[in-house]
């Protein structure tokens, strides 16, 4: 088996697309557009980190803040992003929920007629998916605009139109568009043949390495398989040490930890659907016995599968009612 990075360079669109398909099928994402900001000269927007208490209070809602700059220029400070430029059409996502600040690129020029528009919202994923999301994505990521005519640009134009002059059912439509933004932005971040970039690493970066992308796609599609470290390394044609280094570098977790997070996320999703027995779900995600699955689920999620099915999977009430974004002025 090859060691180091031999044979791992270069893009493979098929593997990258397959990876994104599997991940989006695994994690249910809802969205809310909360605020539409009109930006003036010297504007600043600062948000504090999400607290552990807030995260615990919303068992079914791990919130990922996002910001879309429709017009103007900004500077961003966030976890892993320092003095990062943000331009019209860029999307800032905060999977880690950390403190962040956006501000006018040139606050000293207060006499200029500055104009800009910023959309602020959040993606909502089930709490059982929170660890996986934190492994898959960096704490903060800037998705650069692919340019005119791209899917991301067209989606943002529709969000802007609906936020500016909502039609019948506008609140519900904005909710669906905000949820779709998660997938469209990640597609742009993974390339999609366009010059979009993510300015931080994550497991999604494995899509750039054909061997690793193919391995992750097969892991996501065959959770019942008895995956071992030796088997994963052989599948990727890498040494065990190279495989471990690749995962640790991208996500800060080992291949085994990543596999466990994926299995628990899929199990929680199936439990919420409520159509299968606990034993059947455990078998489907790779556990030889119901008892072993029960122990693993409680250790990872903090409650038994039955408790999660009965109450832990309830939707955060704050995400149920669609509402139009509040409009406010900054600067």
Predicted regions and their residues:
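Loop/turn positions that initiate beta-strands
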Residues: 89-90
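Short amphipathic alpha-helical interaction/hinge segments
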Residues: 100, 104-106, 185-189, 193, ...
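Generic protein-terminus/edge-of-domain signal
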Residues: 1-84, 100-105, 321-323, 329
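A short, Lys/Arg-enriched amphipathic alpha-helix from helix-turn-helix/homeodomain DNA-binding modules
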Residues: 148-160, 174-178, 194-227, 232-236, ...
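Amphipathic alpha-helical segments enriched in hydrophobic/aromatic residues interleaved with Lys/Arg
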Residues: 119-180, 184-189, 193-194, 200, ...
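Basic/polar phosphate-binding segments, predominantly the helix-turn-helix DNA-binding elements
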Residues: 184, 188, 218-265, 282-311
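Ligand-binding loop in jelly-roll beta-barrel domains
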Residues: 82, 97-120, 124-127
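Mature, function-bearing regions of proteins
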Residues: 316-320
């Amino acid at each position: 088996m090859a060691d180091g990075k031999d044979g791992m360079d270069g893009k493979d669109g098929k593997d990258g697309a397959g990876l994104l398909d599997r991940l989006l099928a695994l994690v249910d994402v809802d969205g809310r557009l909360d605020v539409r900001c009109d930006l003036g000269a010297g504007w600043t927007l600062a948000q504090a980190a999400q607290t552990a208490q807030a995260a615990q209070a919303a068992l079914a809602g791990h919130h990922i803040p996002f910001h879309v700059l429709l017009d103007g220029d900004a500077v961003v400070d966030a976890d892993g992003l320092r003095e990062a430029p943000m331009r019209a059409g860029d999307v800032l996502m905060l999977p880690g929920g950390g403190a962040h600040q956006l501000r006018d690129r040139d606050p000293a020029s207060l006499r200029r007629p500055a104009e800009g528009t910023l959309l602020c919202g959040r993606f909502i994923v089930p709490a059982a998916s929170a660890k996986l999301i934190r492994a898959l994505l960096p704490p903060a990521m800037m998705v650069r605009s692919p340019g005119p005519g791209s899917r991301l640009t067209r989606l943002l134009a529709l969000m802007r139109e609906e936020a500016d002059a909502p039609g019948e059912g506008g609140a519900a439509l904005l909710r669906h568009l905000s949820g779709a933004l998660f997938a469209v932005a990640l597609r742009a971040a993974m390339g999609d043949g366009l010059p979009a970039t993510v300015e931080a690493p994550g497991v999604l970066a494995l899509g750039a390495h054909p061997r690793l992308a193919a391995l992750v796609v097969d892991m996501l599609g065959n959770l019942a398989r008895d995956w071992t470290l030796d088997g994963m390394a052989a599948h990727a044609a890498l040494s065990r040490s190279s495989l471990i280094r690749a995962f640790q570098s991208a996500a800060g977790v080992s291949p085994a930890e990543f596999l466990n997070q994926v299995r628990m996320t899929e199990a929680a999703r199936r439990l919420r659907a409520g159509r299968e027995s606990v034993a059947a779900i455990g078998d489907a995600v790779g556990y030889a016995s119901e008892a072993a699955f029960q122990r693993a689920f409680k250790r990872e999620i903090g409650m038994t599968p039955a408790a999660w099915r009965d109450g832990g999977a309830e939707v955060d009430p704050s995400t149920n009612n669609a509402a139009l974004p509040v409009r406010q002025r900054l600067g």
